[in-house]
């Protein structure tokens, strides 16, 4: 019995170190797998930057201006940038205008909804919609870093109607030159026609005075002196 118990004890003493070594190896493997998983997750997070969803065109909206014009707007995409068309009705008048810009770079980093909401607010706050040639639609999310995202007015039916009327009302400089040059020959002609009449009246007056003061005998001599002394009455 004693020999059997001693053999069992010796076997247990030999097995314990082996079990401890296996347990340490298994613990190391678990720690290594967990660390590698955490490292892969940690490396994967900063590599992916959050980006907004691509814009689905056309984008549409409606608004009412401070001067009670009912308007609607729609955005279409071009090869470079976008075009925003505004159509309004005020009483019996209808007018429209176009804005252009390129917010593509800004929309890749910011939310589309924020940008288009600010564009809609800017349209509603316009004092004279489609009537100011210097009108620019700006947004707080893009205008500092992306100035090309500002939408500028490029065409308007209101501004195009004003120009022809101004050109018709203003006379051209060629018209004024023709009037002045055509009137000058008439003046010279009237001046030239007045000279013979003036000379005939002077001669008649001189002859009358010579006959009254000098008589018929000395009339011709007096007439000669009077023509030298008296000037033309004209």
UniProtKB/Swiss-Prot annotation:
Q: Which residues form a coiled coil?
A: none
In the UniProt record, the signal sequence range is 1-23
Q: Does the keyword Electron transport apply?
A: no
Q: Which cellular components does GO assign to this protein?
A: extracellular region; plasma membrane
Glycosylated residues in this chain: 155, 172
One Pfam family of this chain: FGF-BP1
What is the top-level taxon of the source organism? Eukaryota
Q: Where is this region: Sufficient for interaction with FGF2 and FGF2-induced effects?
A: 194-234
Q: Which GO terms describe its biological process?
A: cell-cell signaling; positive regulation of blood vessel endothelial cell proliferation involved in sprouting angiogenesis; positive regulation of cell migration involved in sprouting angiogenesis
This protein's major location comes to secreted
Topological relation to the membrane, as annotated: Peripheral membrane protein
Query: What the protein does?
Result: Acts as a carrier protein that release fibroblast-binding factors (FGFs) from the extracellular matrix (EM) storage and thus enhance the mitogenic activity of FGFs. Enhances FGF2 signaling during tissue repair, angiogenesis and in tumor growth.
Q: Which family does it belong to?
A: Belongs to the fibroblast growth factor-binding protein family.
Quaternary structure? Found in a complex with FGFBP1, FGF1 and FGF2. Interacts with FGF1, FGF7, FGF10, FGF22 and HSPG2. Interacts with FGF2.
Its recorded name reads: Fibroblast growth factor-binding protein 1
Lineage of the organism = Eukaryota, Metazoa, Chordata, Craniata, Vertebrata
């Amino acid at each position: 019995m004693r020999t059997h118990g001693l053999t069992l004890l010796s076997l247990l003493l030999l097995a314990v170190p082996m079990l401890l070594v296996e347990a340490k190896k298994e613990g190391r493997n678990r720690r290594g797998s967990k660390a590698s998983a955490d490292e892969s997750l940690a490396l994967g997070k900063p590599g992916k930057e959050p980006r907004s969803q691509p814009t689905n065109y056309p984008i549409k909206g409606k608004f009412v201006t401070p001067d009670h014009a009912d308007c609607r707007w729609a955005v279409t995409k071009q090869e470079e940038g976008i075009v925003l068309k505004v159509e309004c009705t005020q009483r019996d008048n209808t007018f429209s205008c176009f804005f252009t810009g390129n917010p593509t770079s800004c929309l890749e980093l910011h939310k589309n909804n924020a940008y288009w909401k600010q564009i809609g607010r800017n349209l509603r706050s316009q004092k004279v919609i489609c009537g100011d040639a210097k009108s620019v639609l700006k947004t707080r999310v893009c205008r500092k870093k992306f100035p090309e995202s500002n939408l500028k007015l490029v065409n308007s039916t209101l501004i195009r109607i004003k120009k022809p009327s101004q050109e018709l009302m203003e006379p051209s400089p060629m018209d004024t030159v023709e009037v002045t040059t055509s009137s000058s020959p008439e003046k010279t002609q009237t001046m030239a026609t007045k000279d013979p009449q003036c000379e005939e009246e002077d001669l008649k007056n001189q002859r009358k005075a010579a006959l009254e003061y000098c008589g018929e005998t000395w009339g011709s001599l007096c007439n000669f002196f009077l023509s030298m002394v008296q000037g033309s009455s004209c």
